[in-house]
Amino acid sequence: MRIKKKGTSGNAKNFITRTQAVKKLQVSLADFRRLCIFKGIYPREPRNKKKANKGSTAPVTFYYTKDIQYLLHEPVLGKFREHKTFAKKLQRALGRGEVSDAQKLEGNRPKYTLEHIIKERYPTFLDALRDIDDPLNMLFLFANMPATDKVSHRITKEAEKLTNQWLAYVAKERLIKKVFVSIKGVYYQANVKGQEVRWLVPFKFPTNIPTDVDFRIMLTFLEFYSTLLHFVLFRLYNDANLIYPPTIDTEKLKGIGGLSSYVLQSKDQGVKALLPNAKKAADSKDESKKVKETKLSKEEISKAVAADKSLNENAEDNVSENVEDVELDEFSSTNKTAGDLLSQPSKFASPTSTLLSKFIFYVGREVPLDILEFCILSCGGSIISEIALDELQLNQPEEYKKLDLSNITHQIVDRPTVASKVAGRTYVQPQWVFDCLNKSELLPVSQYAPGETLPPHLSPWGDAGGYNPDAEVKPTEQGEEEEEEEEEIEGDEIEEDVEEEDEEEDEDLQAQKELELEAAGVKSADAQKKDKKSSKGKKRSAEDEEKDLKKIMMSNKQRKLYKKMQYGIDKKEARQDDLTKKRRKLEKTKAELGKLNKKN
């Protein structure tokens, strides 16, 4: 039997360190990181680090050897090497002062594409849709960032364009399902091709960019994510029979911007627009052909006409024979009644897609237009902005006078009072739109009137801890809490004496006990309550004993797992109890304030 050489099998063969991988690929560390991000290769943790590192215990990063071998055949790797030589040549030309050569080199800069990597990592379109959450979050983050020395203006504009194209598609197809306005930003959830997609849009506030963030890694992710979103948007727009990329109204983009500046046209409309131009071009070609045609003699024309007649007669005879021979099949309908025919589902079958279709909203200038515009358009509603009307009044006063604002049904305001109200309009706060969208129904407007205290804006995805804020507080729980407070005030000595008493006492002993308690100044009703609590405590102690016995029978691994599980359960229950106590206190204060207001 041959002796195996150390470090040639097992973990030492399956894993490779980062320094070894960089040497093998012959690239810089920055290019290696970019390549790993593009290909989706991440560090691995071997079971035995010492064996994987061939006896060394130094802290290192490991990768699978197969992954690094897979990177050797990547075309982008060759482009990285070409760029390295290009940078050397450019630096040499600039150092010599050869500006024309430097310009030629700049024109021939090596470029790479990520299309083949997208196809490798996402073989089907649904795979890309399932992984679209992180790209959307990253792109919306960069779209709201200001341009700095590390992040150029071109990158932020490209991210903004892609995100607006995504929002325009979701609003056009009415795919939005849930909205939640939080401290971090606005969470949206849409159902795209049967896949639930959730993303976060930050608020458009001035942001302080931290200095400890490595923007090189973030920009690498952004490059990959933008390519992926281009693929997804192209497929979604084509499936919806829309032109991609959508046309942009430059006048609106200079003014308000947002979704209103993106004009989504179907491909049929684009073809109709091109048809008149095509007809004109065809007519001009025919005219030129007529001019170029030579005049034929009368004999040639008569021969051609006779030949055409004979061909037409033969063709008609053949067609009549074929038609006589063919017998058409008759398909009788199996449906006895005409009412049994099923109606096809409409495009906007979900309740949220047509929730606000009958309303026209007038949005005040103090309300964030981008959030409400997206939500209202996704629910089928129409929107008129006060800011857009102000711009129209300044730039085109004649068209502004022709506008008819009598069709407006709702006005969204975010002010405590409205100075002058228009008859026929319903005045609501912005939260009404979000809550209606989350509940998939129109809620009463009275709670959302200007100046009213709004109901709590709850997350539509619920609480992971199990706390339900909509659930009513049971009166029994309140009674138990009051009993606990009373018992805390009373003396501990009497409690201990009562808990030690047994339930199966004789009547004489019970009477003697009541006399002793009355002498101590405790009422008989309170003593009965304490007896009940003592019985509950005994039941709990019996359950605890059973649990302890079960723990003894567990193995060491099972016991540790049970402790971890119990710790998590206790933590959730403690959080739930704290939240219910806070809610009870709030309800008490509200009730007291209501009583004071009634008295006044």
Curated annotation (Swiss-Prot):
Gene Ontology BP annotations: maturation of 5.8S rRNA from tricistronic rRNA transcript (SSU-rRNA, 5.8S rRNA, LSU-rRNA); maturation of LSU-rRNA from tricistronic rRNA transcript (SSU-rRNA, 5.8S rRNA, LSU-rRNA); maturation of SSU-rRNA from tricistronic rRNA transcript (SSU-rRNA, 5.8S rRNA, LSU-rRNA)
Segments passing through the bilayer: none
A Gene Ontology term for the protein's cellular component: preribosome, large subunit precursor
Presence of the UniProt keyword Nucleus in the record: yes
SUPFAM superfamilies for this protein: BRCT domain (SSF52113)
Keyword Glycosyltransferase: no
Disordered as annotated region, ranges: 454-600
InterPro entries per record: BRCT_dom, BRCT_dom_sf, PES
Bias type Basic residues, positions: 530-539
Bias (Basic and acidic residues) ranges: 569-580, 588-600
Key words of the record: Coiled coil, Nucleus, Ribosome biogenesis, rRNA processing
Domain BRCT: 351-450
Similarity comment: family membership: Belongs to the pescadillo family.
Name of the protein: Pescadillo homolog
Source organism of this protein record: Debaryomyces hansenii (strain ATCC 36239 / CBS 767 / BCRC 21394 / JCM 1990 / NBRC 0083 / IGC 2968) (Yeast)
Gene from which this protein is expressed: NOP7
